[in-house]
């Protein structure tokens, strides 16, 4: 029988857990919408390589930023909770850092940060793909379609998890994508 290393099990459990799912969804939304904004903003260029570089560069920067942001925010929250527990237990500062629970929480925090950043990077790469395959105008419309599809699927998923109407949840996400597209087209046309 195949044995899965304990650290890999921890990663899989985090991905399948509530935190992992939340960061995957958040990252995909963040990445796809920000990349859509970048490709629309850069679409005035006659050179697809400029749009591709801007989209991928922005996506990678956004992904790395989300790794750092998620890890920093989660760790700060974890530390605040640890300090409060130590005070209520009348223990000295740092006492709980040696606990298995604390070490597991730190590991999950790091995994969630990575999940967020990787999901953001993947989400941002998807709207850029059409610029490898089509002329700029066609690629732009395909990128918008891809982003709308991603967000509709995520909306349906969110609706299913939250026991809401999945179609309405999907439509709400599509409305967000359309709002981003319209605003970014307005900005692109202004310059």
From Swiss-Prot:
It comes from the Archaea. This is Uncharacterized protein MJ0645. Coiled coil: none annotated. GO terms for molecular function: iron ion transmembrane transporter activity; manganese ion transmembrane transporter activity. It is found in: Cell membrane. It is a multi-pass membrane protein. The chain crosses the membrane at residues 24-44, 51-71, 114-134, 139-159, 167-187. Keywords: Cell membrane, Membrane, Transmembrane, Transmembrane helix. GO terms for cellular component: membrane; plasma membrane. InterPro entries: Ccc1_fam (IPR008217), CHP00267 (IPR006682). It comes from Methanocaldococcus jannaschii (strain ATCC 43067 / DSM 2661 / JAL-1 / JCM 10045 / NBRC 100440). GO terms for biological process: intracellular manganese ion homeostasis.
